Amino acid sequence: MQAAARAGADAIGLVFYPPSPRCLSVDWARQLASEVPPFVSTVALFVNPAAAEVYTVLERVRPAMLQFHGEDSAVFCAQFGVPYLKACRVKPDVDLLEYLRPFSGAAGWLLDSHVEEYGGVGESFDWSLVPAERSHPLVVSGGLSSENVATAVRRVRPWAVDVSSGVESSKGIKDPAKVAAFISEVRNADV
């Protein structure tokens, strides 16, 4: 986390999805969040959570933003009174704007790969499926690494990018050199 902040990350994701090797306990996440430097945000990531779980994280970890993957409704996502990103798993037969329309209260929309499991599997999606017309800031995720993120930024022109497995040395373990290379590629492409 410190390596990401030093390299220039704008936000640090804290995963609260038990099947993920990146999942954090609330206590560990609270400790990590307390070490995040000023001007770097924390984002709590959930997949189909119970409301009580989200409230616990909000109370104890105090993330700046929530990120919802899964089948959560717009009403569910908005009930916490905290800015949130709604994720959409992209595939050719999904009308992204139609899928995301109910989430007009979201701070932004995160576009991710449509794969069997959630999160950090290293597969990208066809960026040509991203609509040119947008009503919300877009975050691109899914299969990004230092090798392809510059292309994604140039093609999609997202508000932000989100990375996990693309900067890991092994599942759940971030590699500081890969993190720095990724952020450098993003900055070089975003001109």
Q: How would you describe each model-predicted region?
A:
Residues 1-191:
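Conserved N-terminal beta1-alpha1 strand-loop-helix module at the mouth
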